Structures are given as structure tokens and as C-alpha cells.
Amino acid sequence: MDSRCFGFFFTLLSLNVIVLAYDPDTLQDLCVADRTSGIKVNGFTCKPESNITASDFFFAGIGKPAVVNNTVGSAVTGANVEKIAGLNTLGVSLARIDYAPGGLNPPHTHPRATEVIFVLEGELDVGFITTANKLFAKTVKKGEVFVFPRGLIHYQKNNDKAKPASVISAFNSQLPGTQSIAATLFTATPAIPDHVLTTTFQIGTKEIEKIKSKFAPKKV
């Protein structure tokens, strides 16, 4: 193949890969999610336009702080296609994260989206880790913005041990997905074999079981 033709082909292929790396583009003005449909597609099927209302594009759930009542000290309120049906095929979503004093949003990833946070209140230590195990960390304050690249492990921690904090997160996916590193490893169903975890973390079975017990549902 002529080198110029190969170069042109490679460029087209690269552009195609980039385009396919995010949520697919919409092919019509509206494709409001029909969450009752049993049909499985990459996203949701569209409800009939005659059934679409303004409410399909509205959500009031991130206007005020969430109640934080867990051991890590943070609560995430999603504003994605599961809450706003009109986001289907649009490739964007939001979330609000509220932190108790000293609260942490533990290390996690979003496999389908880059995240941008805007600090509403407080001061947070934030950071992400590259595949080369390099940490990029920063302290961000009210009115400031920080970016977490798609798929990389990241975290946020409220610096203030006396006051709460909150951020708004924006994603370039209607449903970015979240995998908490610790919970994923220690609460998977079926469970990851203990010998995998003991070898990975270089600790004994008793320590593994102790960690798992921390994530077990609390008995009422």
C-alpha cells in the first residue's frame, strides 16, 4: 500500500476511534429514555415523542445538601439518565457530592467518563493517579475547578474537620458508572477468592476477613 494512502487510512481510523470513545451522538432531536422497556441497547430505547413532557428534562435533586450518614463521610446524588430521562443519548450528566467535616469520597473510577468538579463550599484535597502510578494532587477551594481524566483512580477529601463541603460534578456521559476500589474488591458477588486478595495485598486471610467485615451490611 502506498505510504500516503496508508497514512490517510490510519488518520481516518484514528478519528473514528476517538469518536467512538465517548457516548454515541444522537441521531434525532429527542430520545427520552423509556426506562420501562425490556429492550437492552447501549443506552435506553426512546419513548414515543407524544409521551414526552418538560418533566423528562427536569430534576430538583441536587439543589440542597444530601444527608451524610455513612462511615466515609460523603454522599453522592446523581443527576444522570436514571434520574433525568431526557439525558438519553445526550452524553452529559451531573452529580452533587456532599462531605461531612473531614469526609472522604474514597478512591474510585468512572469507566465511561471524565469528571470535572466545581467546589460549591469548603476546601478539599483532591487527586488522581495515572497508569504510571504518578499522583497529581491539589487543594481546591470554593469557586475552583479540578479535572479527573476518564477511567483513572481519584478521590476527594474535605479538609475542614468542623465544616461540611460540597461540589458539583460534570461528566461527558449520560451514565458514567462508578467503581469504588475497596468496595469492588471486598464486596464483589461472587466474592473474589481470598487467595487472590492475600497475594495481591501480601496479608493473611484473617486480615482479609477483617476488611470484608468492615464493608458488610450493618445489622439492624
Curated annotation (Swiss-Prot):
Residues 58-209 form the Cupin type-1 domain. Coiled coil: none annotated. Disulfide bonds join 31-46. The keyword Cell membrane does not apply. Mn(2+) binds at residues 108, 110, 115, 154. It is found in: Secreted, Extracellular space, Apoplast. Transmembrane segments: none annotated. It comes from the Eukaryota. Oligomer (believed to be a pentamer but probably hexamer). PANTHER family: GERMIN-LIKE PROTEIN SUBFAMILY 3 MEMBER 3. This is Germin-like protein subfamily 2 member 4. It comes from Arabidopsis thaliana.
